Regions:
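N-terminal Rossmann-like dinucleotide-binding module
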Residues: 1-47
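Beta-loop-alpha module in the N-terminal Rossmann-like domain of NAD(P)-dependent dehydrogenases
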Residues: 50-75
Length: 75
């Protein structure tokens, strides 16, 4: 079996996004590399190297294999 990890992004990093992040981290084939949420005032990186953005356009510039959309239903 391949050791390749799928690079994952999360759009919407509130309660649901953070919960999804926890579940994704528990899977050996996936790795969260970037997240975005309007609550972030600027772009940067967390201590573990995961990048964060305040807008989804920057997130989409990442070379992702999958994107989890964790936005409220009304959006």
């Amino acid at each position: 079996m391949s050791d390749k990890k799928f690079k994952v992004g999360i759009a919407g990093y509130g309660v649901v996004g953070k919960r999804r992040h926890k579940y994704i981290d528990g899977h050996p084939a996936f790795q969260v590399v970037a997240v975005c949420d309007v609550a972030f005032e600027q772009s940067g990186s967390f201590d573990d190297g995961i990048r964060y953005y305040s807008d989804y356009n920057s997130l989409l510039e990442e070379e992702l294999d999958a994107l989890f959309v964790c936005l409220p239903n009304y959006l």
